[in-house]
Swiss-Prot record:
Residues 31-45 have a biased composition (Polar residues). This is PBAN-type neuropeptides. Residues 28-73 are annotated as: Disordered. The keyword Repeat does not apply. Pyrokinins mediate visceral muscle contractile activity (myotropic activity). It is found in: Secreted. GO terms for biological process: neuropeptide signaling pathway. PROSITE patterns: PYROKININ. The structural similarity of PK1 and PK2 to CAPA-PK might compensate for the apparent absence of CAPA-PK in ants.
């Protein structure tokens, strides 16, 4: 459904949105001041000496209020200049292994592995390396027994086992057997 309205209101709304959005992106070129090595386009005075203030406040010089950023977080959130401390025992071991003329094979073993690798077993009670041997079968019919080529007809089972659905007939048949 298309709603028609006053074109003057639509143009005024469009101009208001355009000027509101472009106002936050104006750059302020500062003359002097403390930039702390930052570029002049990024000087909003939000962080000085590692202490940051909220960026939603209006700066008094420019009158620009910085908006909230809903995009992805940019930059690293952790200090990258921290030195990794090496355990002195490991450092001593590395120095011993690093001596010239000595050949070592280093194998790394993971310390905390949560999942253990499982061994595939094709049949219960048999390992994957074992082969099926004919003498393992308890009955010779296990080996030679094949599935019938056609499905059996209803009611014809070859050793006949009475079904519980037959009710009284199953009791009389079981007495005869």
């Amino acid at each position: 459904m298309i709603v028609t309205g006053n074109p003057v209101c639509a143009i005024a709304l469009l101009l208001c949105l355009v000027f509101r959005a472009s106002g936050e992106y104006e750059l302020e070129m500062s003359s002097g001041g403390s930039n702390d090595g930052r570029s002049p386009s990024n000087d909003f005075g939000s962080c000085t000496d590692g202490k940051c203030t909220k960026r939603t406040t209006t700066t008094q010089e420019s009158g620009i209020s910085s908006g909230m950023w809903f995009g992805p977080r940019l930059g690293k959130r952790h200090k990258s200049n921290e030195k990794q401390q090496i355990n002195p025992e490991i450092e001593m071991l590395v120095n011993a292994l690093d001596q010239p003329g000595m050949r070592w094979t280093v194998i790394t073993i993971p310390a905390n592995e949560k999942r253990q690798p499982t061994q595939f077993t094709p049949r219960l009670g048999r390992g994957s390396e074992e082969k099926f041997i004919y003498s393992d079968a308890t009955d010779r019919n296990e080996i030679d027994e094949d599935d019938p080529l056609f499905t059996p007809r209803l009611g014809r089972r070859v050793p006949w086992i009475p079904s519980p659905r037959l009710g009284r007939q199953s009791r009389s048949v079981s007495r005869k057997i």
